[in-house]
From Swiss-Prot:
Protein known as: UDP-N-acetylmuramate--L-alanine ligase
Record-linked Pfam families: Mur_ligase, Mur_ligase_C, Mur_ligase_M
Catalytic reaction annotation: UDP-N-acetyl-alpha-D-muramate + L-alanine + ATP = UDP-N-acetyl-alpha-D-muramoyl-L-alanine + ADP + phosphate + H(+)
Functional summary from the UniProt entry: Cell wall formation.
NCBIfam families the UniProt entry points to: murC (TIGR01082)
InterPro entries xrefs: Mur-like_cat_sf, Mur_ligase_C, Mur_ligase_C_dom_sf, Mur_ligase_cen, Mur_ligase_N, MurCDEF_pg_biosynth, UDP-N-AcMur_Ala_ligase_MurC
Subcellular location, record wording: Cytoplasm
This enzyme's EC code(s): 6.3.2.8
Residues given in the record as ATP binding sites: 118-124
Biological process, per Gene Ontology: cell division; cell wall organization; peptidoglycan biosynthetic process; regulation of cell shape
Lineage of producing organism: Bacteria, Bacillati, Bacillota, Clostridia, Eubacteriales
């Protein structure tokens, strides 16, 4: 099944789970372009309210009666097979498409698709590329995994041939895409509930590269051995980036007192320009280099690259300063993989502080178990760590792994750590601990951000 953005305008599209970040974004793009849209979700949300305002039919709860004169039903991997709307659509031969298939079909209607992949950094890099494209005024369509202030949300329905989106490797969903420019930021072990091992993940990224046409471009991190290996077999044009290696490199790097970097950008031996970032950490230099390489490939002006990156001050839940209370700075970050946690902590160490106190909420039992040893070594430099209980997401607790067990392992590695079960207990614990100049850092992909909000409101 495919969907034609230009010729299927008369079709009505129904989204099961319309309240999700990506699904609501897809629905909004369709509504902006004049399609009839309906959708269901278990709970209301600001995103759903926004879709209602744009004319979507919204149903709370899942019921076969919600499928009303629908031509295509779109669903995510999170929707179980016994969902009544999914069952009804199958029984009545209504066209079904996964979220990834549908997004791929939307991309097919554009010429310059920029698909940003990698285990870490997708949302930030997609946001950086978006800032540059908007500064250049190319009127792109944008679909990003976090809220971006410049577009007042996570989606923008542009009218040009430019389409900028994240390309997630989970369940190989990005193999449904049509990239003209494919970015690979890094390849790391994750989603081991789906993939056999890291080699399996690397092979899937190689398949993603094969989707790029010969006249298209792969933007590849030359400092990542697995990315470099995948890039060496590409049949399209390849532009590499990195700090130590690559066609596009950062030199003369310096950090200010807030941990924000400035650096010179070189193309081979040629100095192009100087960049000033307003997001912290060495990892964001690599993210910026990939955005710069993408923009140069599209012949976007140097001025728009410089100004676009300077105007980017982060997305929600990516080293987001939530507030300051009694001299204590509360910072929240979506990091849920050991590599991401280390990068976030490096950024925190470069931020002005006395002590760093951290709350980590592990995300899914399968990830916590498969990366247990890596997690136990990820919190070096934290003055004290509290683990909230594991955020289950789509999984069930088998009793094999727990936050308590992880906390004990972290203690053995020399970082003071404990496990508290309720958010209220965690907030009260830190209320008695923190002093002027300290940082409270909440980390995880679940709802751990609420702890910081509770701390600031008490």
């Amino acid at each position: 099944m495919s969907f034609d953005l230009k010729n299927d305008i008369s079709k009505k599209i129904h989204f099961i789970g319309i309240g999700g970040v990506s699904m609501s974004g897809l629905a909004e793009i369709l509504l902006e372009r004049g399609f009839k849209v309906s959708g269901s979700d278990m709970n209301g949300s600001p995103m759903i309210d926004k879709l209602k305002e744009h004319g979507a039919e919204i149903y709370l709860g899942h019921n076969e009666k919600n499928i009303n004169n629908v031509d295509i039903v779109v669903y995510t991997a999170a929707i179980p097979e016994d969902n009544p709307e999914l069952i009804y659509a199958r029984k009545n031969n209504i066209s079904l498409m996964t979220r990834a298939e549908f997004l791929g079909s939307l991309m097919k209607g554009h010429k310059y698709n920029i698909a940003i992949s990698g285990t870490h950094g997708k949302t930030t890099t997609t946001s950086m590329v978006s800032h540059i494209a908007l500064t250049e005024d190319v009127d792109p369509t944008i679909l990003v995994g976090g809220n971006l202030d410049i577009i007042n949300g996570n989606v923008l329905a542009g009218k040009s041939d430019y389409f900028i989106t994240e390309a997630c490797e989970y369940k190989a969903s990005f193999l449904e895409f049509y990239p003209y420019i494919g970015v690979i930021l890094n390849i790391d072990a994750d989603h081991l509930d789906y993939y056999k091992n890291i080699d399996d993940i690397e092979n899937t990224f190689a398949k993603f590269v094969n989707l790029i046409p010969k006249e298209g471009y792969l933007i590849a991190n030359a400092d990542d051995k697995r990315v470099a290996r995948v890039a060496s077999n590409a049949t399209c044009n390849v532009v590499s980036f990195g700090i130590d290696n690559g066609d596009i490199r950062a030199k003369n790097i310096s950090f200010n007192e807030s941990g924000f970097s400035s650096f010179d950008v070189y193309k081979s031996s040629e100095l192009l320009f100087n960049i000033e970032l307003n997001v912290p950490g060495k990892h964001n230099i690599l993210n910026a280099l990939s955005a710069i390489a993408s923009a140069l490939t599209l012949k976007i002006s140097h001025k728009s690259i410089i100004d676009g990156l300077k105007s980017f001050k982060g997305t929600h839940r990516r080293f987001e300063i939530k507030g300051v209370k009694n001299g204590i700075t509360v910072i929240d970050d979506y990091a849920h993989h050991p590599t991401e946690i280390k990068a976030t902590l490096d950024a925190a160490k470069n931020y002005p502080h006395n002590k760093i106190y951290c709350v980590f909420q592990p995300h899914t039992y399968s990830r916590t178990l498969s990366l247990f040893d890596d997690f136990s070594n990820s919190f070096s430099g934290v003055d004290e760590l509290v683990l909230a209980d594991i955020y289950a997401a789509r999984e069930k607790d088998t009793g094999v792994v727990s936050s308590l067990k992880l906390s004990e392992a972290i203690n053995k590695n020399g970082v003071k750590s404990s496990n508290l079960h309720s958010f209220e207990d965690i907030v009260n614990y830190f209320k008695s601990k923190l002093n002027d100049g300290d940082i409270l850092l909440t980390v995880g992909a679940g709802d751990v951000f609420k702890i910081g909000e509770m701390f600031l409101s008490k």
